[in-house]
UniProtKB/Swiss-Prot annotation:
Subcellular location(s) per record: Nucleus
The protein, known as: Transcription factor 19
CDD domains the record matches: FHA_TCF19, PHD_TCF19
Binding residue positions for Zn(2+) 2: 310, 313, 336, 339
GO cellular component term of the entry, any: nucleus
Any one biological process term the GO annotation gives: regulation of gene expression
Any Pfam family the entry gives: FHA
Residue positions, PTM Phosphoserine: 78
An example Gene Ontology molecular-function term: zinc ion binding
Organism annotation: Pan troglodytes (Chimpanzee)
């Protein structure tokens, strides 16, 4: 980490300029600010009133102090330089502190626009590759090639980007978002560290017809015993339903025995808990299918016909034919007369 000091521009039309200074080790130096780019390290070129900034407007004097720098500001302008809104006498040096506000140009009367060049002074410690710093100052009265702004590049082999491909968003934008303690921020290497993000997989939008529909497994049903409701015929019975309910058709429908989840099979996996469920199904075909197993079927004509399955032989009966109630079938085991006779013998 290198001790540096910065000028962060927070006023004017452009804003966002950040100048980082790192004097040569072991020696003091002077940096100049003004509109003469050939003589100054920081060129201040006003867009509104060019006459308000002198050729060499002010100087920053840096002297080593321990492992840090003592920086003072000296005014050389005809229009004035302000530190914390107090005008600095011409030719007078003032030591700067972290967080001081510097204004280059006259202080306008109340109600007028402020100076274009309004900076905050900061003392920071940064890595060389984090900032492009002004190192060697220009000699007085000379315009040497290579003097002034000289970027501090990372060590050999470290990843870097050319200065011509810098991001349009200046680094100072990150600092402006947290004015409270600018010098205490830990700078992020944005200038020379490439941040190529790999292709991100975006979620594939679902077709319009599938929005809001999620497949779900049919509810678990008891294969041993159930109660059905047979609805009366509808006028539009000829139109098949779009999504038939996944429930057991009546056992008289032999064509769908293999697909009905509640049709009894030869291989039983133990006695499950009895849980009769009522579900609407299509009406039975007249004269077809398996009838009720009761010896004397009363052929119920109600709109809703309830069925119950024997817990012994898995045969289905009309609830009305066996003389029990739906509530009793839910709460206790049901045995048909044949199974009860077999138990007694």
């Amino acid at each position: 980490m290198l001790p540096c000091f910065q000028l962060l521009r927070i006023g004017g039309g452009r804003g966002g300029d950040l100048y980082t200074f790192h004097p040569p080790a072991g020696a003091g130096c002077t940096y100049r600010l003004g509109h003469r780019a050939d003589l100054c390290d920081v060129a201040l070129r006003p867009q509104q009133e060019p006459g308000l900034i002198s050729g060499i407007h002010a100087e920053l004097h840096a002297e080593p102090r321990g492992d840090d720098w003592r920086v003072s500001l000296e005014d050389h302008s005809s229009q004035g330089t302000l530190v914390n809104n107090v005008r600095l006498p011409r030719g007078h040096r003032l030591e700067l502190s972290d967080g001081d506000l510097l204004t280059f140009g006259p202080e306008g009367p109340p109600g007028t626009s402020p100076s274009e060049f309004y900076f905050m002074f900061q003392q920071v410690r940064v890595k060389p590759q984090d900032f492009a710093a002004i190192t060697i100052p220009r000699s007085r009265g000379e315009a040497r090639v290579g003097a002034g702004f000289r970027p501090m590049l990372p060590s050999q082999g470290a990843p870097q980007r050319p200065l011509s491909t810098l991001s349009p968003a200046p680094k100072a934008t990150l600092i402006l978002n947290s004015i409270g303690s600018l010098s205490k921020l830990r700078p992020q290497p944005l200038t020379f560290s490439p941040s190529w993000g790999g292709p991100k997989s975006l979620p594939v939008p679902a077709p319009p017809g599938e929005v809001g529909t999620t497949p779900s497994a049919p509810p678990q049903r008891n294969r041993r015993k159930s109660v059905h409701r047979v609805l009366a015929e509808l006028d539009d019975e000829s139109e098949p339903p779009e999504n038939p309910p996944p429930v057991l058709m009546e056992r008289r429908k032999k064509l769908r025995v293999d697909k009905a989840p509640l049709t009894p099979t030869g291989n039983r996996r133990g006695r499950p808990r009895k849980y009769p469920v009522s579900a609407p199904v299509a009406p039975p075909a007249v004269g077809g299918g398996e009838p009720c197993a009761a010896p004397c079927c009363c052929l119920p004509q109600e709109e809703t016909v309830a069925w119950v399955q024997c817990d012994g032989c898995d045969v289905w009966f009309h609830v009305a034919c066996v003389g029990c109630s739906i509530q009793a079938a839910r709460e206790a085991d049901f045995r048909c007369p044949g199974c009860r006779a077999g138990i007694q013998t």
